[in-house]
Swiss-Prot record:
Sequence positions that bind GTP 1: 10-17, 57-61, 119-122
Self-association state and partner proteins as the record states: Associates with the 50S ribosomal subunit.
Binding of GTP 2, residues: 186-193, 233-237, 298-301
Coiled coil: none
Family under the similarity heading: Belongs to the TRAFAC class TrmE-Era-EngA-EngB-Septin-like GTPase superfamily. EngA (Der) GTPase family.
Gene Ontology biological process terms from the UniProt entry: ribosome biogenesis
KH-like domain sequence ranges: 358-443
Annotated InterPro entries: G_ENGA, GTP-bd, GTPase_Der, KH_dom-like, KH_dom-like_a/b, P-loop_NTPase, Small_GTP-bd
Claim: Repeat is one of the keywords in the record: yes
Gene3D superfamilies to which the protein is assigned, alphabetical: 3.30.300.20, P-loop containing nucleotide triphosphate hydrolases (3.40.50.300)
Name of protein: GTPase Der
Length: 447
């Protein structure tokens, strides 16, 4: 038995994302006064009282037909079809607007159980005839921001969804447990959402030629070769100097937070847009956060065959030159829209995830260390004593992190550390993941 699904529907800025966050087990949606912040349907585990369910937030819809509007309607329609119950939301402050009437008719034609949720009711509220004209038999007044009215909402939900079919508190959720969290990041319009849609074979995310369609991180649980994967689509990251509006700043912050929580990050690059400093900045940020990284060059089908070899040579040169701290990053060339080479990306993610989790025994580490340091000795210091690295151990994985003991660690140069790291990558087959060294002074400086 699976959890019942509740979908939030309404025009822009009625408070759907605020209620989504209020009912979610953890906050997931960006909230902003600007209408239309939500553009994809978002899923989360929700809870109200003892009742647990799957909650879907949908884009705000209005009456203006255009390419973007049609795609938003498609996202909302899919969420309605999935729903066991619809919470149709309106704004008590603005009252019933023409868009509310149009959307209520749109929702009712699907004959789904529904509740009219009148939001932003910070004071006592009386329903007038305009609310009844929307055609819903259940109406609740709440304030999602302040959490008032949720007990009444709970009672209505239970009345609409029989308890024995709805409450799943003692049933294991197959989505929960260990999973590989993959964040898809990159500059705007690189094809991140198109790539995820191609992988899961569903128009789950809004796509189009407009840059910046995705405004917040969207999580999708998925299975690939018996591996539980959480795919996370993110808003495109631009240079700080070009981010001016507060909403875009929120989106950028949301993306950066998603990277911090990722296991692996796919850096999506547009083959038609030259590799820019911002791409390298994103990659450096991923590495500094200790995440594993796979670089994907999208729209490869649009590059002329005669230019592909030169493109790849220059691309590898730029990556190896500007990201020497993670030599061997997997680079794949794909066409998301044509589904070309997209599964190779997931295979690369699974492989680098294993490397990111790699544990090396202390005996093997020190056998390697003795051989490597003897092959390239550190210079003699004043007094004729040589700086030595005598012993090492792995202290953690994700990323692989090592503690090295030296008689004089402050004299170990960055270039010597790079020598050790690069040699370790080759010796233990660890390409493309951050490797961290910390040095500790031994008690006896003459050892």
């Amino acid at each position: 038995m699976t959890k019942q699904i509740i979908t939030l529907v309404g025009r822009p800025n009625v408070g759907k994302s605020t209620l989504f966050n209020r009912l979610s087990i953890r906050k997931k949606a960006i909230v902003h006064d600007l209408p239309g912040v939500t553009r994809d349907r978002k899923y989360t585990d929700g809870k109200i009282g003892s009742f647990e369910f799957l909650l879907i937030d949908t884009p705000g819809l209005d009456e203006h037909p255009n390419s973007m509007g049609e795609r938003l309607i498609e996202q909302t329609t899919k969420a309605i079809l999935e729903a066991d119950l619809i919470c149709f939301m309106v704004d008590a402050r603005s009252g019933i607007l023409p868009d509310d009437k149009l959307l209520s008719s749109f929702v009712r034609k699907y004959n789904k159980p529904a509740i009219l949720v009148v939001n932003k009711c910070e004071k006592a509220f009386d329903f007038d005839k305009e609310y009844y004209k929307l055609g819903f038999d259940s109406m609740i007044a709440i304030s999602a921001e302040h959490g008032t009215g949720l007990i009444d909402l709970y009672d209505e939900i239970i009345a609409k969804l029989p308890e024995e079919e709805s409450i799943e508190t003692n049933i294991a959720d197959p989505i929960k447990g260990d999973c590989l969290q993959i964040v898809v990041s990159g500059r705007p319009n690189a094809g991140k959402s198109t790539f995820i849609n191609a992988l899961i074979n569903d128009e789950r995310l809004l796509t189009g030629p407009e840059a910046g369609i995705t405004r917040e991180s969207i999580e999708i649980d998925w299975q690939y070769k018996n591996n539980h994967i959480k795919l996370i689509d993110t808003a495109g990251l631009r240079k700080k100097s070009t981010i001016t509006e507060s909403l875009e700043k929120l989106s950028a912050s949301d993306t950066i937070n998603s990277i911090k929580l990722a296991n692996t990050v796919i850096l999506m690059i547009d083959a038609l847009a030259p590799l820019k400093q911002q791409d390298l900045n994103i990659a450096s940020h991923v590495v500094n956060e200790g995440r594993s990284i796979v670089i994907v060059v999208n729209k490869w089908d649009l590059v002329k065959e005669s230019e592909k070899e030169a493109f790849q040579e220059e691309f590898y040169y730029q990556i190896n030159t500007h990201l020497p701290q993670v030599k061997g990053i997997p680079v794949l060339f794909i066409s998301a829209i044509n589904k070309q080479n997209i599964e190779q990306v997931l295979d690369a993610c699974l492989k680098i995830y294993k490397i990111w989790n790699k544990k090396i025994t202390t005996s093997k580490l020190n056998e390697w260390l003795n051989f490597t340091t003897e092959a390239h000795l550190l210079p003699l210091q004043k007094g004729g004593r040589r700086v030595r690295v005598k012993y090492m151990t792995q202290t953690k994985t994700r990323p692989p992190t090592f503690k090295l003991f030296s008689n004089n660690p402050e004299k170990i140069t960055d270039s010597y550390t790079r020598y050790l790291v690069n040699n370790m990558r080759e010796a233990f087959d660890m390409p493309g993941v951050p490797i961290r060294f910390t040095y500790v002074k031994t008690k006896n400086p003459y050892v």
